[in-house]
């Protein structure tokens, strides 16, 4: 198997964009077919996001959303579902109820599902992985937290941590009303309300 640098060099050796696209598609298809053969002729599906290459892109364009439900249905239509599914995942996560719908759909179609995580299957990707019969990971592979995450103060934080912070504020203020002055600048940053 070639290294990342070798693949980039092979791609760059193509003389024009049309041949680069043909090289990419041809090698991608050949790789999926090779994985299928290695996995006893299972159906192989790749779900990936360019979230590492496009960090400034809006998250909604890079994560699992309700649109992916139709994508999964379209790709799976016509597959011999008795062969099982090998799902290769690379995702930062996404919308929880969209993930639940995808898992329900996959489970309704395949009696045996395995997930390969080459690098990242975070958050909602972790949920899909945990719903599989098997997860195949390398040394560098990572799963992520599955608790709800929310934007707060320009960063993503655990919704449970926000609730815990509110409970702490409530307790401290109910025990000593003067604590309200200390919590006043903090509380607006904890939630969307």
Can you name each region flagged by the protein language model?
Residues 1-120, 126-193:
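Terminal-region recognition feature
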